[in-house]
A protein has these predicted regions:
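A mature extracytoplasmic/lumenal domain signature
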Residues: 49-51, 121, 148-151, 187
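Short beta-strand->alpha-helix linker/helix-N-cap micro-motif
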Residues: 111-129
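C-terminal/domain-edge helix-coil "capping" segments
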Residues: 24-43, 51-56, 114, 175-242
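A structural "domain/chain start" motif
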Residues: 25-113, 237-242
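Solvent-exposed, acidic/flexible segments
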Residues: 92-103, 159-163, 214, 218-229
């Protein structure tokens, strides 16, 4: 197992912890329902547009290695990297454009909901403050929409099934006052038990007994991820409809 793969595995561990908690903080995720009447003046919005993932993770959340200190952590990272590589060798992120598919439907959906939309490209790995600022300073906007969007496969334990997991957060801010006009978190597929998110079930057959089953029918594995796109787009657009 290469150091780069293990390093990415460690990043996945941190990232997923953030996604499952909808934020790397001890406080609860603070939702904000969209108030159409109060936001009547919002016409033009800048939308944070992330590029696609270069890998889709395959991770066991409660890995046995987590109980054995530093050595266990190394074993866990290596195992996660191996499973992630196995998934991506079959799935091929170049043929699985989950994020691009999301924006291809979300941007027109927001326009149909009554907004003028400007997409602002942001590169994955950018510092959160910089990723926010590049959207916040877009010229002549009334509000800006911050998004996170990440997908992969999760299993609760070493002997439990893998489920698709796509996590998305959306936050609309007033450009002048910086007030939060809308804030919501969505989880598709794997149920983390987090009561602060909108959880959306995946299809019943999107359940894979182990990593070998996960890659045995890769078209089904891909479809179980991409099925999230329409669901999440429709949910967000409905929330923000004018």
């Amino acid at each position: 197992m290469t150091e780069s793969l293990m390093g990415r595995s460690a990043c996945f561990t941190l990232l997923l912890g953030c996604l499952l908690l909808t934020g790397c903080a001890t406080t609860r995720f603070e939702k904000q329902a969209f108030n159409n009447e109060a936001s009547a003046g919002i016409k033009k919005i800048a939308v944070q547009q992330w590029n696609d993932q270069d890998e889709y993770y395959a991770r066991v959340l409660n890995h046995p290695g987590a109980s054995f200190g530093l050595v266990g952590a190394v074993i866990m990272a290596a195992d996660t990297a191996q499973k992630t590589k196995k998934l991506n060798d079959a799935l091929d992120p170049r043929n699985t454009k989950l994020t691009a598919d999301f924006y291809a439907k979300a941007l027109p959906g927001l326009r149909q909901a009554g907004y003028e939309v400007v997409a602002v490209p942001v590169t994955r790995g950018a510092q959160p403050n910089l990723a926010k600022d590049v959207v916040r300073v877009t010229k002549d906007q009334d509000a800006y929409l911050l998004l996170t969007f990440e997908g992969g496969y999760l299993a609760a334990g070493a002997s439990t099934a893998y489920y698709p997991f796509v996590a998305m957060t959306a936050e609309l801010n007033d450009s002048k006052s910086q007030a939060v006009l809308y804030k919501e978190a969505y989880h598709y597929g794997y149920n983390s038990g987090n009561k602060d998110v909108v959880h959306i079930e995946a299809a019943a057959d999107c359940k894979f007994a182990d990593i070998d089953k996960l890659v045995a029918d890769i078209e089904k594995t891909r479809a179980c991820l991409t099925a999230s796109v329409d669901i999440l787009v429709n949910q967000m657009v409905a929330d923000l409809k004018k």
